[in-house]
């Protein structure tokens, strides 16, 4: 049974999704899929397959010219910090926690009052963990941070760096990542 904070957070996300206006066709197509997933009580559990809610942080520097990305150890990709909700239905808190854990940043300022982007992406099977291919229903928040602040690479990453937005495609040219950059223009 969900507590009142969890119910409130889930309802808040559902309301935000229903009210969300985007010019991107792929995001519009994701909205009903997110809403359908959120009807399941285990949507925030990583064990819920074929997919579950995740939260991530698109962190830009103070002048908006760079983004902080991590080189994910298991996926071998440059990505924004983020991860599993593990039952926490406050997806903003999930994104903030993951940003702190994966970058060491403790002073992040949210830009905007709601999520910045949504995405559904496939995660390959992990035979070493006996985990099948599944989808991450990623709720992305925009944050700003001081690029001079000390960074700390987590065990989940092999590298961490501020990347000029103009060079982003050299690190990750996936459509959903480039969409995040285009939203800053």
What residue spans do the PLM features occupy?
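Predominantly extracellular/luminal regions of secreted and cell-surface proteins
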Residues: 2-32, 103
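Unchanged
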Residues: 86-176
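Acidic, metal-coordinating catalytic segment for phosphate/diphosphate chemistry
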Residues: 19-56
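Compositionally biased, intrinsically disordered linkers/stalks adjacent to structured regions
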Residues: 182-185
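Short histidine-centered beta-strand/loop micro-motifs
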Residues: 48-49, 68-70, 83, 151-154
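Glycine-rich active-site/cofactor-binding loop and its immediate structural neighborhood
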Residues: 62, 67-96
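Short connector loops at helix/strand junctions that flank enzyme active sites
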Residues: 50-54, 62, 73-75, 80, ...
